[in-house]
Amino acid sequence: PGDVTINGLDLGALTSKMDPDDLRQLADGIDLSMLISGAWPMVVLGFVVFFYCLGSLYDERKDRSVLFWKSLPLSDRDTVFSKAASALLVAPTLAVGAAIACMFAFMLLVSAFVLLHNGNPVSLLWGPGSPLANAGLLLASIPVYALWALPTVGWLMLCSSWSRSMPFLWAIMIPVFAGIFISWFEVMNVFDLQSAWFWKNIVARSLLSVFPGTWVDVMDIGAIA
C-alpha cells in the first residue's frame, strides 16, 4: 500500500516500525487533534452562557414573562438559582457531551480513512491515543467550569436584574471604566500591586470566566503535563 501521512506522520513507517519517541509523538498528535475537534462546542458554550445570563432576568421583565414565574410556587431565590444552575451545570454538560461526540466522530472518520489505505486504526489511532482519558478530562472540567464561571454568571445576572435598558452595555462599561479609573489614578499602588492585577483578576474575571479554558493561565501547566 502507498504511504499516507496525517499531521506529518507517515502511516506506512509507523505501521512497520515505531520506536518510543514515534509512539509518544503519535499519541500527542492524536490527543491534540481530538481536543481540537471537540473545541467548537466549548467556544459556543461561552457565548451562549454569556448572553443567556445577560438576558435571563432582563428579558422576563421586558416581556412580562416574570408574571408567569411569580404564578408558580417558586420563590424569586429559587428562580434565580434555577437559572444559575442552567448556566453553570446544564449548559456545560450539554457542551461537553457535544464535544465528546465530536471527538469520537473525528476518530471514526480518521479510522475509516486509515482502513481505506490498508492501515490498522487500532494500532495507529485508538492504541496510541487516549480517547477515554480525553473524554474523562472534559467531564472532570464541568465542576471546574461551574466554580470558575461563577463570578461572571453572578455579575451578568446582577446586571440583568437591575438594568432598565441595555444590560450588555452596563455589564461591559462598569468593569471596563473601573479598570480605566484604577489605571489612570494608579490606585493599585496603594496595595503594592500593578493595574494589570485589577484588569486580570477583576475585569477579565467578571466578563470572560464563562469561556472554558480561561483558568489555564492560573494553573501550573508543568504539573499537569
Language model: regions and residue ranges:
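Hydrophobic alpha-helical transmembrane segments of multi-pass membrane transport/permease proteins
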Residues: 1-17, 40-50, 97, 173-186
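Low-complexity, proline/glycine-enriched hydrophobic segments characteristic of transmembrane helices
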Residues: 2-29, 194-225
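Secretory targeting signals
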Residues: 16-47, 82-161, 220
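Transmembrane helix boundary and interhelical loop/hinge segments in multi-pass membrane proteins
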Residues: 51-70, 81-84
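Perimembrane helix-loop junctions in membrane proteins
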Residues: 56-63, 106, 110-118, 165, ...
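Short helix-to-coil transition segments within interhelical loops
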Residues: 71-76
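Transmembrane helix segments
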Residues: 132-136, 165-213
